[in-house]
Amino acid sequence: VDLKDYWAIAEADIEIQNPVTDRKLRLLDDYCDIRDGLRVLDVGCGKAWLMRQWADRYAIEGTGLELNPAFLDFARRRRPGRGRIDYVEGPAEDFVAEPNSYDVVLCLGATFALGGFVQAVEWMVAATRPGGAVVVGDLTLKHRPAVNTHQHLPLDAIESLGVVQRHGAEVSAMISASDADFERYASHHRHATLRWARQHPDHPDRDEVLDKSRDGWDYYLRTIRPMLGWTVLVGLKD
């Protein structure tokens, strides 16, 4: 199954495509000083829930980068009330961002689109104007395993904060997903994929979708639930 198709199935029921609530994301209104006239860039925007919320209330100029056409179709069909958002379909790494040109640069759960957390932060800071906000959300390590399992694990929140600051943005705020937030997010994926499989018993991708769903659920239960969290860091560029 094509990964874009899989994620369109797994996230069919959700607009906020991260393990965090709308209430927590609305804190970014203040942390990023959202107001009329700002230029906002959202890397791996998905359905662009956050940027669309801002554009409903403020006359921002937004750009969303996204690889999945299903997510972009969803976002494009919901025109914002005040601002304007342009969407660019394709790999984020192919987008040439003018240096020092955006007031807010977001990447929530999609640092892989820029090569990983460190590379994403470097790219984002370069695109942000001095005084602007860099907003990056990613998996973080909460509890190290008692025995070395030799599996790749993300940085912890303090290490992630250090990466942002070393690249020239002073971290001014953090938002953390709760265990319940992540449980709900993972459960949405699992439920949506199982429902799709029941509704499409003869689909050629059915077995692959179920295999990927089981792998994701197992990773949540065995790795995310006991050891990992998800953290948004807000950095103000020097």
Regions flagged by a language model, labelled:
Residues V118-A133:
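A short glycine-rich, Lys/Arg-flanked "PGG" loop and its adjoining helix->strand segment in the class I
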Residues A177-D238:
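Conserved Class I S-adenosyl-L-methionine
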Residues N18-D36:
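Conserved alpha-helix/loop element of class I SAM-dependent methyltransferases that forms part
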Residues K47-D94:
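Class I SAM-dependent methyltransferase SAM/SAH-binding core
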Residues F95-V105:
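A short acidic, Gly/Pro-enriched loop at the edge of an enzyme's catalytic core
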Residues G37-G44, V135-E159:
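Conserved class I S-adenosyl-L-methionine
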Residues V104-F117:
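A short SAM/SAH-binding and catalytic strip from SAM-dependent methyltransferases
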